[in-house]
């Protein structure tokens, strides 16, 4: 299974990714729903070996897409997940490829903010847009908004529980 990620030009900056070759998805790629893609290093090697993939085509759901870039490797997460095993497409192209051309099927939205105030305003704006787009009222949300801060707190909470559990097990032994 290869992760297809629909995105826009801001994705690279938000995730601190840089191209090792080629370019990244542009606003025009998004606007025109062009059939281009950017590969993680794992998929670049999987499809093309040591060969330069820029300008070559791969088929996604039988439709040819031109490789315009390859991103620098991120390696494995602490949990062992390969962070380079993906294909990035303009989100408009992915929606046309897999779903309807409207944005009702977007699964994940990533963003960054310069301050906590901007982050709160952005979260509020996203919630408002999602409710309007999905025609739902407050309390009927069928989506979730998470921040890295929230995820970090959950991880730290889980780590604390595991530490307590491991301490208890060690005490019993």
Question: Where would I find each of the regions flagged by the language model?
Answer:
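Short intrinsically disordered, low-complexity coil segments enriched in acidic
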Residues: 1-7, 12, 155, 168-172
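Mid-to-C-terminal secondary-structure elements
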Residues: 3-5, 9-25, 29, 34-136
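Peri-transmembrane interface segments
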Residues: 110, 118-119, 123-126, 137-172
């Amino acid at each position: 299974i290869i992760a297809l990620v629909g995105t826009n030009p801001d994705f690279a900056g938000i995730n601190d990714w840089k191209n090792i070759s080629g370019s990244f998805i542009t606003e025009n790629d998004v606007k025109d729903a062009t059939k281009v893609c950017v590969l993680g290093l794992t998929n670049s090697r999987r499809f093309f070996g040591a060969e330069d993939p820029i300008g070559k085509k791969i088929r996604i759901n039988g439709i040819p897409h031109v490789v315009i870039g390859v991103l620098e490797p991120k390696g494995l997460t602490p949990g062992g997940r390969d962070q380079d095993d993906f294909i990035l497409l303009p989100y408009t192209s992915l929606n046309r490829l897999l779903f309807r051309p409207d944005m009702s099927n977007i699964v994940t939205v990533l963003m960054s903010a310069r301050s906590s105030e901007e982050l709160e305003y952005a979260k509020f704006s996203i919630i408002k847009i999602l409710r309007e787009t999905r025609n739902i009222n407050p309390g009927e949300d069928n989506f979730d908004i998470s921040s890295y801060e929230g995820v970090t707190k959950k991880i730290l909470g889980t780590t604390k529980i595991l530490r307590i559990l491991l301490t208890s097990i060690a005490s019993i032994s």
